A protein has these predicted regions:
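Active-site glycine-centered loops adjacent to acidic/histidine catalytic or metal-binding residues
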Residues: 64, 125, 155
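Conserved C-terminal guanine-recognition region of P-loop GTPase G domains, centered on the G4
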Residues: 57, 81-149, 222-225
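Conserved G1/Walker A P-loop phosphate-binding module
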Residues: 1-81, 85-87
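Catalytic P-loop NTPase motifs of RecA-like helicase/translocase cores
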Residues: 45, 68-70, 102-103, 130-131, ...
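P-loop NTP-binding site
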Residues: 190-298
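Conserved glycine(s) of the Walker
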Residues: 22, 161, 252
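Conserved, well-folded catalytic cores of nucleic-acid-processing
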Residues: 33, 52-56, 86, 90-93, ...
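Canonical P-loop GTPase G-domain recognition
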Residues: 119, 128-186
Length: 298
């Protein structure tokens, strides 16, 4: 091992917590790139997404995960498999809560954190919408629950206290060579981000069950000299959902396509020609075969 490798720190920092506490917003802020889609709806994140931050003597491999829930169907079970895997292979757990939720909501996972061998950094997010008294009370409560945890009040949205969180993470990384090349910033490819951008726009533009009944698959992804040609299929579970998604005269789907194309062009730094299609697949959330095709694990 070289002298530089003896000083180099690297490890997996896995982010877990309930839905809607700001895990994805926090990871995007820490990484400095929008890698995880963000909406106000719960269960927006379905996959485990890595964001990699490199320095001369460190590499942090952040991993955003779906919000903790009790699964009602096979898709949600796969989402929770991502969470359980993240707990098992972490060098540091970054547990995110906020000033709104009840601390004892996840007793099962809090019990796991008490037994875990790796460092736990606990972030109380959204302090910008709380009072100092409430934040201090929450910090005291969490310190009683997880005495070994390093606790930070923060606001991912306002980027408050992120420097201190970053310093604590780097200071607790194990000494190790980098896991990835230093010019890599995520483990996902552009096809994945194209599908996630479309799915985000669906979450932002529709309500009720429609966003949760949709999955996006990229059927064509071609890079030309001047633009990307992308064809995406949006799968829904019922014909009525297909009608809602398309909208009168196709206007609703056109809006989603326009918003997605604009964001893709910003993310890919190249022009995008995007085609959207809608198909009905009543069983995609329960079918192991379909879920594997969409990138979910079993």
């Amino acid at each position: 091992m070289t002298e530089q490798n003896k000083r180099h720190r690297a490890g997996f920092v896995n982010i877990i917590g309930n839905p809607n506490v700001g895990k994805s917003t926090l990871m995007n802020a820490l990484v400095g790139e929008k890698l995880s889609i963000v909406t106000a709806k719960a269960q927006t994140t379905r996959h485990r997404i890595m964001g990699i931050v490199n320095g001369d003597d460190y590499q942090i491999v952040y991993s955003d995960t779906p919000g903790i829930l009790k699964p009602n169907y096979r898709l949600q079970q796969s989402m929770m498999n991502f969470v359980d895997t993240a707990i098992g292979d972490a060098d540091i757990i970054l547990y995110v809560t906020d000033t709104v939720e009840k601390g004892d909501k996840n007793e099962e996972y809090i019990a796991k954190l008490k037994k875990i061998q790796c460092p736990v950094v606990l972030v109380i997010n959204k302090i910008d919408i709380s009072t100092q008294e409430q934040v201090l009370k929450l910090m005291k409560w969490w310190k009683e629950q997880l005495p070994e945890a390093i606790i930070f009040p923060a606001s991912a949205q306002e980027k408050f206290n992120l420097d201190n969180i970053f310093d604590a993470i780097v200071g607790n990384l194990p000494v190790a060579p980098p896991w990835y090349d230093k010019d890599v910033f995520t483990d996902k490819n552009l096809r994945f981000f194209a599908s996630e951008i479309v799915r985000e726009k669906i979450f932002l533009n529709y309500k009720d069950e429609v966003p949760y009944s949709c999955e996006v698959e990229i059927e064509e992804f071609k890079e030309g000299a001047e633009r990307y040609d992308i064809s995406a299929v949006i799968y829904v579970m019922r014909d009525t959902q297909k009608g809602i998604l398309i909208g009168k005269g196709g206007q609703s789907l056109k809006k989603v396509g326009t918003q997605a194309r604009i964001e893709m062009e910003d993310f890919f730094q190249k022009k995008v020609f995007l085609r959207l299609f809608v198909k009905v697949d009543p069983d995609w959330r329960e079918s192991k075969k379909e879920l594997r095709r969409f990138g979910y694990e079993y």
